Curated annotation (Swiss-Prot):
Biased composition (Polar residues): 54-66, 189-201
Protein name: Pupal cuticle protein
Name of the coding gene: PCP
Span of the signal peptide: 1-18
GO molecular function list: structural constituent of cuticle
Positions of disulphide bridges: none
Length: 253
């Protein structure tokens, strides 16, 4: 039985003939590296026509995001009749239409506190802009500078605190502080530092002193009273030094 089945299979196999392409072999062209099969002239022509049609359609397409692929929603009629405007519907108002009235615009009933365009505090650059002075500050500054300038220009140079060297406070060694008794610091009233009438004496009270600054503004000049007292004091010292003996023995306290 088994042998008969085997014989029948062999007979069927021998009687069967191959089925498939019976035409001439296709003209297959390979790429230069032999890895890819090139398009036939018919396929290349069809591909070029397809690409040209896509390019032409993309030029006429108002929606650049549409790549031409099929969208199943297009089968629904409601998709084309929706309330919101579609690409083929009535044009909807643009989001950047006419600007709405601003709350601080010119047509407001009362002038807005910031209706005028405010300058940015750093509009000039990265650094903050300087703060402008108020009219009161500017006026006070101008008056102050004018007063300083007037005081400097009116101050005489010979009335400075630093007198010439020959009128120095430090007298030479032979004019020592410890002079003879008759040349003592406490000299007669007409040669004393306190000999000149004081402004606090019984004389009528003077007005407040007119304070004047030095040329560079760093010091206060002597008043006429102080300058006169200083000159009298220096003159008394010079007179005492001139009248003292050259080698008189010094008297110590």
């Amino acid at each position: 039985m088994k042998s008969m089945i085997v014989v029948a299979c062999l007979a069927l196999a021998c009687g069967a003939h191959a089925s498939g392409w019976a035409g001439p072999p296709a003209n297959i062209a390979l790429s230069q590296d032999g890895r890819n099969i090139l398009d036939t002239p018919e396929v290349a022509q069809a591909r070029a026509a397809h690409i040209s049609a896509l390019q032409q359609a993309s030029k006429n397409n108002p929606n650049p995001n549409d790549d031409g692929s099929y969208d199943p929603r297009w089968d629904n009629e409601e998709y084309w009749q929706q309330a919101e405007g579609k690409w083929n519907g009535a044009p909807a108002p643009a989001w950047n239409a006419a600007p709405a009235p601003s709350w601080n615009g010119a047509h407001a009933a009362a002038p807005s506190w910031n209706a005028a365009p405010a300058h940015s505090w750093n509009a000039a650059g990265s650094a903050p802009a300087p703060v402008a002075e108020t009219p009161e500050v500017a006026q006070a500054r101008a008056a102050h500078l004018a007063a300083l300038s007037a005081a400097k220009s009116a101050a005489p140079a010979q009335q400075q605190w630093n007198a010439p060297a020959h009128q120095d406070w430090n007298a030479p060694a032979h004019q020592d502080w410890n002079a003879p008794a008759h040349q003592d610091w406490n000299a007669p009233a007409h040669q004393s530092w306190n000999g000149a009438p004081s402004w606090q004496s019984g004389a009528p009270a003077h007005q407040p002193a007119n304070i004047r600054l030095a040329n560079d503004g760093s010091g206060i000049l002597d008043t006429p009273e102080v300058a006169a007292a200083r000159a009298a004091h220096l003159a008394a010292h010079a007179q005492a030094a001139h009248s003292a003996p050259a080698h008189a023995p010094q008297q110590h306290w």
